[in-house]
Amino acid sequence: MKSRCQKGDKDLSLRVALYIKYNNGKRKMINLQKTDDVRINAINELLPPIAHLYELPITDKAAETVYQTRCEIADLVHGKDNRLLVIIGPCSIHDPKAALEYAQRLLPLRKKYEKELLIVMRVYFEKPRTTVGWKGLINDPHLDGSFDINFGLRQARSLLLELNNMGMPASTEFLDMITPQYYADLISWGAIGARTTESQIHRELASGLSCPVGFKNGTDGNLKIAIDAVGAASHPHHFLSVTKTGHSAIVHTTGNPDCHVILRGGKEPNYDREHVQAAVAQLAKSGISTKLMIDFSHANSCKDFTRQMLVAEDVAAQIQAGENNIMGVMVESHLEEGRQDKPEVYGKSITDACIGWDTTEEMLALLAKANQVRV
């Protein structure tokens, strides 16, 4: 009787254990359904960076273009070169063919003014949004809401490779911790925008980027957040990202000594002599490089693309008057002036309005002439 009872107890224990295991598992599944990914519609696999780097490897010519330009920009940031850095190009790239034509037109001017200007093409693939809208070539390369990001990343790298192979260095804005692994080796200068300058993640990112980086003042005109960002990015950081093979990883950086601030305006423009000198004083007090860049667009142009030339004229006059702390400028320029909602006109922006090619040539001539006093 005792033995049967022991056997029965064992059977009962097994049944109870299985019951508890089953019910706990079921309960866990129900809980996960209630708490995990409740607002995720779908998750699609992304090709790892190495797939694109293997298919589109950097060439010797492209590497030379990037390395040389990075060194030259670093010299500008630290006052070892008196040329003026000009970051110029479309607000955002939506048509690689038009971008290449723009580069082919810009290349002779880069050569023509190489003693006065260091011209780097603006090649922005991601568009930060205040609310919603098209987020750029990487996010939606077909402009149809299909969000073919794998194709967008490949297209971005392909364009950058072609630009650098022709000797045209590229600049871009960095928005996250993952996309730089796909094409940062082809970027000569990077920007952290006004909406992300105060973000700890972006300061950490800048500390590990291999290129010089500019931080814009805040959208309200606050310069201190950009100054703090430059200081933070110069130090080592430790953060989460992915490896070239796509694995989650902890990244340890050395710090980036080649960062600077960008004046882009805020509640009012901040490109004039008074604002520049006030910014220089703030930079000096903070103990970082007093060399700064001026964005001709955004709040400095009051969001009127035609005013970019007025800003250029003011900055050119400051340079001719002996202002040595303006080390660079940013210009939104395209083949055709203005903007459009849909890509109907070739070479015209579908995001922020840009100056056209004729005005671009005039502006570069103006800036080169003004900077002759420094070189």
Short names for language-model regions:
Residues D9-D11, Y19-N23:
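Intrinsic-disorder-associated, low-complexity terminal segments enriched in Asp/Asn/His/Tyr and depleted
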Residues I30-T35, E116-Y271, H275-V276, H298-A299, ...:
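Active-site-facing alpha/beta catalytic cores
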Residues I40-V77:
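N- or domain-start disorder-to-order transition segments that initiate the globular core
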Residues L85-D95, D352:
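Conserved phosphate/anionic-ligand binding catalytic regions in large, soluble enzymes, centered on
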Residues G89, I294, G356:
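Conserved, mostly hydrophobic/aromatic
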Residues H94-K111, F147-Q155, E313:
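Glycine-rich anion/phosphate-binding loops
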Residues S333-N371:
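Internal helix-turn-beta structural module
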